[in-house]
Amino acid sequence: MIPTQPLTADLDCDLGLERPDRPEEACGVFALYAPGEEVARMAYFGLYALQHRGQESAGIAVFEGDRVMLHKDMGLVSQVFDPEILQQLQGSLAVGHTRYSTTGSSRIANAQPALLETRLGPVALAHNGNLVNTVELRQELLAKNHELTTTTDSELIAFAIMEAVAEGQDWRGAIESACRRSQGAFSLTIGTPEALYGTRDPNGIRPLVLGTLESNGQTRYVLSSETCGLDIIGADYVRDIAPGEMVRITDAGLESWTWAEAPQPKLCVFEMIYFARPDSLFHGESLYSYRRRIGQRLAKEAPADVDLVLGVPDSGIPAAIGFSEALGIPYAEGLIKNRYVGRTFIQPTQSMRETGIRMKLNPLKDVLAGKRIAIIDDSIVRGTTSRKLVKALRDAGATEVHMRISSPPVTHPCFYGIDTDTQDQLIAATRSVSEITEQIGVDSLAYLTEQGMLEATRESIGNFCTACFNGRYPIAIPEEIKRSKLMLETVTA
């Protein structure tokens, strides 16, 4: 293992210096099998494209037969890796990960990929998602005297693979066994000495795509959380890995089979609304185009008599353009985003916090002065930063501020890999629209309906998980977890 020097990256910032006022993604995974290529460098670029899915830590494991080298650390991909480190990571198979965690679990031990030694050799695992039976799995492993070194469910899946191998199963059987023991959301990329594996849970809640890269007359296979990870290395998108599907990639090519007994798609609709990059495809559909369509639908459902339409950078912009197009109202770039504000700047004073919104977004006074504006955003979670944003717009001279949200109200927490608050902290779970309108200080507020959100997709509307909007969870949540939103991140041995 290459020695690392942990980099502190423990400050949260967005629209002010508090936690972002929207759900936060948990992870991005990227892997490829490409003998003769610089797989670590390719994985680096893939993770760089997936940086929006996790900014806390990053890691890459590289295999050459039974030999594996791993480098992971706290920080952004560009902070964790440099040319010298990548040069040391030589091999034919790479598994990479970029991570966002919930509060309290920000430590190097939880960075991925998870790496364990088994009877058949090393296994490296990268995971996007969250299990809901983590307490049960953890207790089972501790009862067998396994020494757990992290507070992640990803380590539990890796240990389940190790146990199955110890019982005599081959890699394929062991990975399938671990998947069957795991309940919840998981998209996995797994490196072993003999193959690269990729799989999704039976509901396919978290995304995983397959791509190909032509090199020296050979077809190489790539796995990524999003197609933008394929684009950056020049790989072609082939298809999404199906719910409950597993693929195995070796020198012989690609094998695919369904390990789940009755897969039932329940894709995370928030991937389409916000999480995934707008230049990615979601099951073959352009997310930029989808977000423009939901903006158009929002304009139909909740028009506004205004002079200008603005989008909250960056995620609110496509919907704002669609809203503007549908109503024939000019779209304006009235908010300038400072793209160099991140999670590693100096701790602010309280006075800085009170005016901190301008560290990330600065209104253009000459655009906004004397104008009635509609501001479009993808979601409201707590309402804290929305209130600050509205105040900043009024201070810049806007005479009216009407807010439109391109998703339904978030009323329930996510248990499948998205960092949301407990239900009592979700503003739409405890307040009416009129109360939220008053609290954040807008002249009017409206949300896209759930029907409008789903009808704008090209997928069957029954194929989505919409639990954060209606509480209908596709995978049963244990009551003790539902009451407290106690995920493994907060469990200690």
Swiss-Prot record:
Residues 1-26 form a propeptide. Pathway: Purine metabolism; IMP biosynthesis via de novo pathway; N(1)-(5-phospho-D-ribosyl)glycinamide from 5-phospho-alpha-D-ribose 1-diphosphate: step 1/2. Binds 1 Mg(2+) ion per subunit. Binds 1 [4Fe-4S] cluster per subunit. It is an enzyme of class 2 (transferase). It catalyses: 5-phospho-beta-D-ribosylamine + L-glutamate + diphosphate = 5-phospho-alpha-D-ribose 1-diphosphate + L-glutamine + H2O. One of its GO terms (biological process) is purine nucleobase biosynthetic process. Residues 27-252 form the Glutamine amidotransferase type-2 domain. Mg(2+) binds at S315, D377, D378. Keywords: 4Fe-4S, Glutamine amidotransferase, Glycosyltransferase, Iron, Iron-sulfur, Magnesium, Metal-binding, Purine biosynthesis, Transferase. The active site is at C27. [4Fe-4S] cluster binds at C268, C414, C465, C468. In the C-terminal section; belongs to the purine/pyrimidine phosphoribosyltransferase family. HAMAP family: PurF. PANTHER family: AMIDOPHOSPHORIBOSYLTRANSFERASE. This is Amidophosphoribosyltransferase.
